[in-house]
Amino acid sequence: MRLPIFLDTDPGIDDAVAIAAAIFAPELDLQLMTTVAGNVSVEKTTRNALQLLHFWNAEIPLAQGAAVPLVRAPRDAASVHGESGMAGYDFVEHNRKPLGIPAFLAIRDALMRAPEPVTLVAIGPLTNIALLLSQCPECKPYIRRLVIMGGSAGRGNCTPNAEFNIAADPEAAACVFRSGIEIVMCGLDVTNQAILTPDYLATLPELNRTGKMLHALFSHYRSGSMQSGLRMHDLCAIAWLVRPDLFTLKPCFVAVETQGEFTSGTTVVDIDGCLGKPANVQVALDLNVKGFQQWVAEVLALVP
């Protein structure tokens, strides 16, 4: 039976690969997409998500979400993804529109209609998820688990300690990590290992039309290079859903620093139990890289 999922995203070039896998992996049933400001503005992430859905002729409802973090000024990752968020490929025009309600309400309504609890997947800042949990706490029993791409037990990628998705809205992340829902965190400890090799990247234009599109996007992606390999950060959250055997997880207490002058946005991962607090997150600490690369190749071969 296919696993029902809702995907919250901020496309973003590596988001595009994650969205492809979420749509076409035969084990998954992507029922709703929502967008959030992150890699670029929410208007751009929404436009990019709609372009991808149209490209793949995927009839999946999409709702636009939060334009700004809960309490602080927005930051973006245009330096990594380009000013549009998905530079490098000319998508055809379409007339698709997002739903007429905010993302967190769209998630609430879809959860309440679902016949069974649903897995939420968040591969951008956690603003929409925090709004859902704080404004609609009655939804918690309908969430099977939350799988995120975000955080790190070690170094950061936008500050020495903080990963971008958490640092973009630390207050939202803190709310989510305190919520009591089941959380799986695929952070930089694994996503920095999730590299597509130059040899594989060179095969994409001959794979299919999606391969050609992704190859064009990848030429503008700055998380690695076409010559050294590219990190597929967001794809790790989708990979865990389908191939959890590729990941080494450890239950840990995780908190988010919101006040530090140099550490705001840091996920404090208590690997050794020093704080004596109960674990609230399953933290991915290692990845079977060859297995991941093989799975990616298998999934992208299924995409038209």
From Swiss-Prot:
Keywords: Glycosidase, Hydrolase. The active site is at H233. Belongs to the IUNH family. RihC subfamily. InterPro entries: I/U_nuclsd_hydro_CS (IPR015910), Inosine/uridine_hydrolase_dom (IPR001910), IUNH (IPR023186), Nucleosid_hydro_RihC_nonspecif (IPR022976), Ribo_hydro-like (IPR036452). Pfam families: IU_nuc_hydro. SUPFAM superfamilies: Nucleoside hydrolase. Hydrolyzes both purine and pyrimidine ribonucleosides with a broad-substrate specificity. This is Non-specific ribonucleoside hydrolase RihC. One of its GO terms (biological process) is purine nucleobase metabolic process. It comes from the Bacteria. Its EC number is 3.2.-.-. Coiled coil: none annotated. One of its GO terms (molecular function) is purine nucleosidase activity. PROSITE patterns: IUNH. Disulfide bonds: none annotated. CDD domains: nuc_hydro_IU_UC_XIUA. PANTHER family: INOSINE-URIDINE PREFERRING NUCLEOSIDE HYDROLASE (PTHR12304), NON-SPECIFIC RIBONUCLEOSIDE HYDROLASE RIHC (PTHR12304:SF15). GO terms for cellular component: cytosol.
